[in-house]
UniProtKB/Swiss-Prot annotation:
The keyword Magnesium does not apply. Ca(2+) 2 binds at residues 212, 215, 217, 219, 222, 225. It is found in: Secreted. Residues 6-202 form the Peptidase M12B domain. This is Zinc metalloproteinase-disintegrin-like atrolysin-A. Its cofactor is Zn(2+). Its EC number is 3.4.24.1.
């Protein structure tokens, strides 16, 4: 089945050798890196991952860590610097160091395995090893693949080209495609580690690379971005322009269907009890109106309870929720135990001290139920107390663990009537 859409908020750091390699031309370096990110994004679309560049740092005044040709040593320093420096300045999911140094042992890149979202280890190092942008982009996509749990392809792994992205050796004609093995490794990583940081969609204003219509990232100046006209599945979006069609009224919401407002009168939030009011679409908005309910204190469930914030709390339902079927509310004698203040039998706690219930408040403390043939069953946890708003006597409800007159309980203290 199709994987959930995920977003990698990426920071790329170009070291000082990159700065000198491109003769200090920042515009040229930026353009080179934007091109790399666009390619990485295309490579990851089949995995339903979008890669958003949220920061680009060029070490124009000198390296901020010791960059050496020993890739593993440099990578470790970069991870430490990310924790103590970069993450404090800019929230992001993954950082890649792009270096113009010649890494040892024919290494073109290095990254730890399955570390996405880890503060120190969600990193990679990539050598700017070729004048062909695609080759550098595939290398960075490969290292990012390691962070996402993908190991090198073996002979039994296949994609539609001779060598796939996670091939151990980069070919001169590299592949855009992940193998079946890589896809399985990524799925396993997501299931086992469930990395949270790549679930949130980046803000338009966080993406620093120039907007690209069709990359499925919502960027500044775009109203929508559903991919290429061939793959777009959003009927509201014109894939060619990344603008909404002129007839579109809405894109999403409880009162939005097929890009139009749902007609007035369609229920969008059913009443959850006789104390709640069903809300219907207005025909003018994609949002369901604010949740409204009947006034607090209105009798409900054949006078067994009084409405409280859209519900009708009664002791029987609370007993049922705690103990299941074959329950009844315990006799009054059980509730009298709440006058003791011992153990869990009280109305309130003040500074850790149990305050016993007054005689008239006993049905607002610990809840007692008869379960099968057991009398006075109770739970010691907080959910074993009688709920606020529960009827405790005729014309009375529990408020602040006291059994008070229903008209007093719900009288507005601000002088305004309650909505």
């Amino acid at each position: 089945e199709r994987l959930t859409k995920r977003y990698v908020e990426l920071v790329i750091v170009a070291d000082h050798r990159m700065f000198t390699k491109y003769n200090g031309n920042l515009k040229k370096i930026r353009k080179w890196i934007y091109q790399i990110v666009n390619t990485i994004n295309e490579i990851y679309i089949p995995l339903n991952i979008r890669v958003a560049l949220v920061r680009l740092e060029i070490w124009s005044n000198g390296d901020l860590i010791d960059v050496t040709s020993a890739a593993n040593v440099t990578l470790k320093s970069f991870g430490n610097w990310r924790v103590t420096n970069l993450l404090r300045r800019k929230s992001h999911d993954n950082a890649q160091l792009l270096t113009a140094i010649d890494l040892d042992e024919e290494t073109l890149g290095l990254a730890p395995l399955g570390t996405m979202c880890d503060p120190k280890l969600s990193i990679g190092i990539v050598q700017d090893h070729s004048p062909i942008n695609l080759l550098v982009a595939v290398t960075m996509a490969h290292e990012l693949g390691h962070n996402l749990g993908m190991v090198h392809d073996e002979n039994r792994c296949h994609c539609s080209t001779p060598a796939c992205v996670m091939c151990a050796v980069l070919r001169q004609r590299p592949s855009y495609e992940f193998s079946d093995c890589s896809l399985n490794h990524y799925r396993t990583f997501i299931i086992n580690y469930n990395p949270q940081c790549i679930l949130n969609e980046p803000l338009q204003t966080d993406i620093i690379s120039p907007p690209v219509c069709g990359n499925e990232l919502l960027e500044v100046g775009e109203e929508c971005d559903c991919g290429s006209p061939r793959t777009c599945r959003d009927p509201c979006c014109d894939a060619a322009t990344c603008k909404l069609h002129s007839w579109v009224e809405c894109e999403s919401g409880e009162c939005c269907q097929q890009c139009k407002f749902t007609s007035a009168g369609n229920v969008c939030r059913p009443a959850r009890s006789e104390c709640d009011i069903a809300e219907s679409c207005t025909g003018q908005s994609a949002d369901c109106p604010t949740d409204d309910f009947h006034r607090n204190g209105k009798p409900c469930l054949h006078n067994f309870g009084y409405c409280y914030n859209g519900n009708c709390p009664i002791m029987y339902h609370q007993c049922y929720a705690l103990w299941g079927s074959n329950v009844t509310v315990a006799p009054d004698a059980c509730f009298d135990i709440n006058q003791s203040g011992n153990n869990s039998f009280y109305c309130r706690k003040e500074n850790g001290v149990n305050i016993p219930c007054a005689q008239e408040d006993v049905k607002c403390g610990r809840l007692f139920c008869n379960v099968n043939d057991f009398l006075c069953r109770h739970k010691y946890s907080d959910d074993g107390m009688v709920d606020h708003g529960t009827k405790c006597a005729d014309g009375k409800v529990c408020k602040n663990r006291q059994c008070v007159d229903v008209t007093t309980a719900y009288k507005s203290t601000s002088g305004f009537s309650q909505i």
